[in-house]
Amino acid sequence: MDFMMANTGATGLDTQAQLMQSAAAAAAVAATNAAAPVQNAAAVAAAAQLQQQQQQVQQAILQVQQQQTQQAVAAAAAAVTQQLQQQQQAVVQQAVVQQQQQQQQQQQQQQVVQQQQVQQVQQAVVAVQQQQQQQQQQQQQQQVVQQQQQQVVQQQVQQQVQQANTNGNSGGAQNGSNGSTETRTNLIVNYLPQTMTEDEIRSLFSSVGEIESVKLIRDKSQVYIDPLNPQAPSKGQSLGYGFVNYVRPQDAEQAVNVLNGLRLQNKTIKVSFARPSSDAIKGANLYVSGLPKTMTQQELEAIFAPFGAIITSRILQNAGNDTQTKGVGFIRFDKREEATRAIIALNGTTPSSCTDPIVVKFSNTPGSTSKIIQPQLPAFLNPQLVRRIGGAMHTPVNKGLARFSPMAGDMLDVMLPNGLGAAAAAATTLASGPGGAYPIFIYNLAPETEEAALWQLFGPFGAVQSVKIVKDPTTNQCKGYGFVSMTNYDEAAMAIRALNGYTMGNRVLQVSFKTNKAK
């Protein structure tokens, strides 16, 4: 383009020079003609023509100048356009470089973040492994402690069994035939229908022989109204077993042979000789927890049958739900030695008919209660076991026996707020007399507390006859207090001493005997 513009400019200059030469020649001619004396028409015409040529030359010069100007402007515009294109290319290249740099920086940052995440994951894995190792070490330590505790309990239980066997043998020799005769006439009858009365039992067993006495064991804390005689005074709900004492041993033996396994209503009764009163057979009642909610009485007996003769068994049912139990049961063996073997073999194990490990403990400890129950307390108060009863337990504030004072009934009015004092005061008048159950008052229970929790809480200390939680009829929740009746005073006292001041479900329990309040 620059070459063409240069050529065009040169051509214009040549044309201009030629025109100027022509004008000069014409001027010379005109001058010559002017000098001549004669002016003719040809000269005038030539002058006019020359003038036109000059004008044409000037116009040509202007055109050439315009062309040159246009060419210069076009060249300048082309140069500016080229410069702009170069600048745009430079800007684009710079933007591309910046974008590449940003991408590299982002990739580097992502790599750093990924490395940090990998490090965090590795640290978390190491922490989890360390935690698992610590948990394994703690579990191993707990297992060692539990094994040591079980060994101590087993040793003491074996000592108690040996001592009981020794005492039983010596006692049998001293009692002579009198003890044997009493044993061979007294029968225990299990699995009686709850609606069956003493008169009906007497009528049934008197068909075999002469009866000296009949006693149906009842729960005095639960009211029972005879549907056939609603006006009759209540004697308490039947516990499903009783005793029949014959005059002659042969009649008692005949009753066992004839009536054992008899079907009455929805029950199959079990008739056997009552156990003699000796140390060898005392305290053979076991408390069992952790049972499946759907376990039947037959399944429970099948677990314990290999260890000895079962006198009676019981599974606590949920109120208003016949298909669900409380997961708690009781097994009474014929001899304490049999119960001991069952504890050693089954406690902490998972039988085939269960899904979780079961807890098997003595429920009715004879004689020196502290010798057997005290070693069991650490295992019972183990947090893993306490979680099953709905709350943690801590060391009591005071382990003294002052709470057993007869003044405890009066102190309830001071300890309990508002209307609960009156309720507790009324409860103290319900304490049974000598020979009956020993009722215990428990205060500061959580609203969601159920009777099963108290069964499991007090069961390991001895035989629990009944449990009652006082509920608000509107909300059907616990009012904050309840009652537990135990059949043995030493066991009840041990339970109070261990549980008063303990915490269950973030609540400190107040546990004391119900006593007759002075009027």
Swiss-Prot record:
SMART domains: RRM. Coiled coil: none annotated. Keywords: Repeat, RNA-binding. GO terms for cellular component: ribonucleoprotein complex. Transmembrane segments: none annotated. GO terms for molecular function: RNA binding. Gene3D superfamilies: 3.30.70.330. It comes from the Eukaryota. CDD domains: RRM1_Hu, RRM2_Hu, RRM3_Hu. PROSITE patterns: RRM. Residues 185-276, 284-365, 438-516 form the RRM domain. PANTHER family: EUKARYOTIC TRANSLATION INITIATION FACTOR 3 SUBUNIT G. Probably involved in the RNA metabolism of neurons. Belongs to the RRM elav family. This is Protein elav. It comes from Drosophila virilis (Fruit fly).
